[in-house]
């Protein structure tokens, strides 16, 4: 009789142990799934957070300005060139320097290949300004004031980079990322690249995915090499024989001196 009384008790104890074990395992599984889901959501959120800057019609241009383009002959430009609202007389490139179309607001631009398209240029310049505002307005930078504004000899990763004052590039730098990775650089002051300095892409990074928003004047030193689209609030000066794999989009003027500019 005692044995019969003990058996139900033992059965209940075993059932409780099994239930407890199962519950604990289930909790571990749920926790693991939750952690994995949270990480995945964070990863997806990070990727969605930084989108490329939409250039609109400005994307079609290698050089686009509001107040003219000066030039020391010869330069070699691959991509369209335009200036607006200033007269085409302020665009001082020759037709044989441009592999693309030269757009002006009037008949004063260089002949014989100049195309007059005031409405199209108005749209492109408006899109350029919108793109600048977009890039400048991106918040929550991944990297803030790297190198205290002096970034020679370092490798920059994809993401949103911000400098709250001037930026100097005194020696070579590297941009390391995949083919689809986006780089956005916000510079609150001037941007200066020293002479003979090179910007080098690694890991499949592409110039078309690199955007530099600069509040102050931009100076690219003699024989330097630059990668990406420059969205300048003021002027962009490209010194003697410097090269650019990207775009020069300036809200004032661009100055050239025997340069090679190639739209990505």
Give, region by region, the residue ranges found by the protein language model.
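Bacterial N-terminal signal peptides that target proteins for export
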Residues: 1-9
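Solvent-exposed adhesion/ligand-recognition segments of exported proteins
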Residues: 22-264
